[in-house]
């Protein structure tokens, strides 16, 4: 029997709705990965509602929880770590400590960093110390980096002038350590307004993917978290990076179609679960170069 992968997901959690782990854990489980959720915050709901209740996990608790898993002899079974929203740079350093601990007992373990800073339509949402930490420390340890356009701009200190400029910016991040950069949401002058575009960049090649842009009265939250989680899950299940990229785009589109059909502000993950596991649509990633 083929072994089921195990993944430690360290990011935010909401009681109501879908953001952070609340957007990523169930879909990753649904495609066949055992997920160990470690919630960096627990809020009543995501912050785009304008009000919420809850608390942030103290940074020192992250390595304590990792050591608790080690104490029962299970840490070596962790195949990957996913990190998302950070409340502080101290919390980020605690996560990197956990990643290092896991890689020490399982050198093959992967680390995907979703460098959450904000959304292009909503602005930056983290303190400057978090942005600095992500660029100066997290990127170097990440096997996979999954920024959106705002985060790519922040890393590179400028906005792109074209699709090929986005490609060059993403490639520049490879020099800092990651084996692959997945840009979850491209935005550049001349981009077609009816398309949603993504980019996958590795040392061996680069691929561009375009899918239809679906209209919503209010953009659902958690799409980036869903994207990063599914991409890492599919890699753990044996997909090539390109195949994982294509699968992720299709599965996320299926969720958005169901969400749109239900006129819902929150992602309709449960209703779309079969199509997450078995997308009906397919979007081809096209090789791209200078």
UniProtKB/Swiss-Prot annotation:
It catalyses: pyridoxal + ATP = pyridoxal 5'-phosphate + ADP + H(+). Pfam families: Phos_pyr_kin. The keyword Transferase applies. GO terms for cellular component: cytosol. Pathway: Cofactor metabolism; pyridoxal 5'-phosphate salvage; pyridoxal 5'-phosphate from pyridoxal: step 1/1. ATP binds at residues 114, 151, 184, 211-214. Its EC number is 2.7.1.35. GO terms for biological process: pyridoxal 5'-phosphate salvage. Belongs to the pyridoxine kinase family. PdxY subfamily. This is Pyridoxal kinase PdxY. It comes from Pseudomonas fluorescens (strain ATCC BAA-477 / NRRL B-23932 / Pf-5). The lineage of its organism: Bacteria, Pseudomonadati, Pseudomonadota, Gammaproteobacteria, Pseudomonadales.
């Amino acid at each position: 029997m083929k072994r089921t992968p195990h993944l430690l997901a360290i990011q935010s959690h909401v009681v109501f709705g879908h953001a952070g782990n609340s957007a990523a854990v169930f879909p990753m489980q649904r495609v066949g990965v055992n997920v160990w959720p470690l919630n960096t915050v627990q809020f009543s709901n995501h912050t785009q509602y304008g009000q919420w209740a809850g608390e942030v996990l103290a940074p020192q608790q992250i390595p304590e929880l990792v050591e608790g898993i080690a104490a029962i002899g299970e840490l070596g079974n962790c195949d990957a770590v996913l990190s998302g929203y950070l409340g502080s740079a101290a919390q980020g350093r605690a996560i990197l400590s956990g990643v290092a601990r896991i890689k020490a007992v399982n050198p093959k373990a992967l680390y995907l960093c979703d460098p959450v800073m904000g959304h292009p339509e909503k602005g930056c949402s983290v303190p400057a110390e978090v942005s600095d930490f992500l660029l100066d420390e997290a990127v170097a340890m990440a096997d996979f980096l999954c920024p959106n356009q705002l985060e790519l701009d922040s890393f590179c200190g400028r906005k792109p002038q074209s699709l090929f400029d986005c490609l060059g910016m993403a490639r520049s991040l490879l020099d800092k350590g990651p084996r692959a950069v997945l840009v979850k949401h491209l935005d550049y002058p001349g981009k077609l307004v009816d398309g949603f575009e993504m980019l996958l960049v590795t040392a061996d090649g680069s691929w561009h993917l375009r899918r239809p842009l679906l209209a919503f009265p209010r953009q659902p939250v958690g799409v980036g978290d869903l994207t990063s989680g599914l991409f890492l899950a599919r890699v753990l299940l044996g997909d090539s990076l390109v195949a994982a990229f294509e699968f992720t785009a299709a599965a996320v589109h299926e969720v958005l179609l169901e969400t749109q059909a239900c006129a819902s502000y929150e992602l309709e993950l449960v209703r779309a679960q079969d199509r997450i596991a078995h997308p009906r649509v397919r979007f081809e990633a096209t090789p791209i170069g200078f």
